[in-house]
Amino acid sequence: MVKGVAMTSLAFDTPYRGGFSGREHHFALTVYFEDTDTAGIVYYANYLKYMERARSDMLRAVGIDQRAALDAGEGVYAVAEVAIRYLNSARLNDDLIVVSSLETIRAASVIIHQRVMRRTDILTDARVTAAFLTLDGRPKRQPTEWVDRFRAINEQGI
């Protein structure tokens, strides 16, 4: 027990990960001091980091193991394009949710719509194109099983 705070084994054994609500993946995070500038406002590039974490968590949630694909030489996702609008600022200690949804699924890429939100306020609105590449950087068809999982999410959610 930390002074005045009861801790369960769950707090140490199972890190929180995001999850799906229908077709949307929700990833929770808190703004820490390292994320902010001297005014306590989140530095603009950190929103891209938040969205990257959410995309990685979304892939894990549907059973896609990026590390295993990399180790096996199958390929990797790399961001090919980002279109982002900054609408409002997050501040130190804010609790945020990154909401991600699959917008377009192509043979060698996927477009993901991502919003960073504080409660009901949209702070950023982005569309991220992630290309699937060989280990030497050439476009490659995504594994069929992965495409099928993405399509199932778009059709029926999780």
Question: What label would you give each PLM region?
Answer:
Residues V42, Y77-V79, L123:
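A broad, structural micro-motif
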Residues D71-S101:
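Helix-adjacent hinge/juxtasegments
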